[in-house]
Amino acid sequence: MINPIALKCGPLAIHWYALCILSGLVLAVYLASKEAPKKGISSDAIFDFILIAFPLAIVGARIYYVIFEWSYYVKHLDEIIAIWNGGIAIYGGLITGALVLLAYCYNKVLNPIHFLDIAAPSVMAAQAIGRWGNFINQEAYGKAVSQLNYLPSFIQKQMFIEGSYRIPTFLYESFWNLLGFVIIMMWRRKPKSLLDGEIFAFYLIWYGSGRLVIEGMRTDSLMFLGIRISQYVSALLIIIGLIFVIKRRRQKGISYYQE
């Protein structure tokens, strides 16, 4: 089993979970800052946005998680802020981040569609890295299986939880996000292939589809009244993405992303 603490200096402990999230953040900021000027948004605007959005997204992700695990946290109030032990919900972070983005664009008079198109691939890449934090913490795993011989030994060992090998759903989602990132990065280079907003719509459809399937394999999903919350949110993302694309394609005068 991998030690969840990457580095310890006196009372200060740096967790792998935090390093995975921060690594994803750094990559996301780099990618977005390189792409932003092509759509008339300065790199400084990206940095300013991240300084506001990232901490709020972490808080939002934690609140989302705590709400749906309230039966536990109401008895352990001191653990509510212990995010270093895991327990942040991606959808909570995404929803918070999207709301902050809309508010930021309104305040700075920026086109939110352009901003969302720039952010989407960057977020996908960050998620691909961030999921490895779940691997270290032995969370976001799937059902018990007899063996995992198709995986490297270090993954097999870390996925041996509570006396059984577990489906590495974190790995499936990480790979799915990475594949989606590669596809959209290649696609957006093709002239007149994507309208403004369709990169963001692709993210909604792609991530929603993958999460909808993968969530069904998990055993530690957040539940509400016996329902897997993330599957319903995923289905909603897919529907929103499809409706968005259909409406954009029917509208006249919508610019191509590459213009």
Swiss-Prot record:
A 1,2-diacyl-sn-glycero-3-phospho-(1'-sn-glycerol) binds at residue 131. InterPro entries: Lgt. The chain crosses the membrane at residues 12-32, 41-61, 80-100, 109-129, 167-187, 194-214, 226-246. Keywords: Cell membrane, Membrane, Transferase, Transmembrane, Transmembrane helix. PROSITE patterns: LGT. Its EC number is 2.5.1.145. Pathway: Protein modification; lipoprotein biosynthesis (diacylglyceryl transfer). GO terms for biological process: lipoprotein biosynthetic process. GO terms for molecular function: phosphatidylglycerol-prolipoprotein diacylglyceryl transferase activity. It comes from Streptococcus pyogenes serotype M3 (strain ATCC BAA-595 / MGAS315). It comes from the Bacteria. This is Phosphatidylglycerol--prolipoprotein diacylglyceryl transferase. The gene is lgt. Catalyzes the transfer of the diacylglyceryl group from phosphatidylglycerol to the sulfhydryl group of the N-terminal cysteine of a prolipoprotein, the first step in the formation of mature lipoproteins. PANTHER family: PHOSPHATIDYLGLYCEROL--PROLIPOPROTEIN DIACYLGLYCERYL TRANSFERASE, PROLIPOPROTEIN DIACYLGLYCERYL TRANSFERASE. It holds the Pfam family LGT. It is found in: Cell membrane. It is a multi-pass membrane protein. One of its GO terms (cellular component) is plasma membrane. Belongs to the Lgt family. The keyword Ion transport does not apply.
